[in-house]
């Protein structure tokens, strides 16, 4: 437990930031799973590409702002693009 006022404030700030960061990562997880689900269910190519674009946009934003490591963002984008290309070749 914090003993000083400033420590209490830091605890509150930390809790708020932690909650915000978790929400952002959760959004990303949902977007990535959405792309995977659309590919698995053989959805329309345009629908898959739209989901891909939104996921890549979110990855870029979170990587630049350091919510996730930039290399992780790059790796996930690469994995998504490989999945998308394989899906396009399959059709």
UniProtKB/Swiss-Prot annotation:
Biased composition (Basic and acidic residues): 1-21
GO biological process: translation
Protein name listed in UniProt: Small ribosomal subunit protein bS20
Region (Disordered): 1-25, 71-91
Signal peptide (residue range): none
A Pfam match: Ribosomal_S20p
NCBIfam families tied to this protein: S20
GO molecular function, one term: structural constituent of ribosome
Known role: Binds directly to 16S ribosomal RNA.
Family according to the record: Belongs to the bacterial ribosomal protein bS20 family.
GO CC, one annotated term: small ribosomal subunit
Alphabetized HAMAP family for the sequence: Ribosomal_bS20 (MF_00500)
Organism: Prosthecochloris aestuarii (strain DSM 271 / SK 413)
PANTHER family: 30S RIBOSOMAL PROTEIN S20 (PTHR33398), SMALL RIBOSOMAL SUBUNIT PROTEIN BS20C (PTHR33398:SF1)
SUPFAM superfamilies cross-referenced by the UniProt entry: Ribosomal protein S20
Keyword entries, A-Z: Ribonucleoprotein, Ribosomal protein, RNA-binding, rRNA-binding
């Amino acid at each position: 437990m914090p003993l000083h006022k400033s420590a209490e404030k830091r605890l509150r700030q930390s809790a708020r930031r932690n909650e915000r960061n978790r929400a952002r990562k959760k959004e990303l997880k949902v977007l990535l799973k959405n792309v995977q689900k659309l590919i698995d269910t053989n959805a329309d190519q345009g629908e898959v590409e739209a989901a891909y674009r939104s996921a890549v946009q979110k990855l870029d934003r979170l990587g630049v702002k350091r919510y996730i490591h930039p290399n992780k963002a790059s790796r996930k984008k690469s994995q998504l693009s490989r999945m998308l290309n394989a899906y396009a070749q399959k059709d």
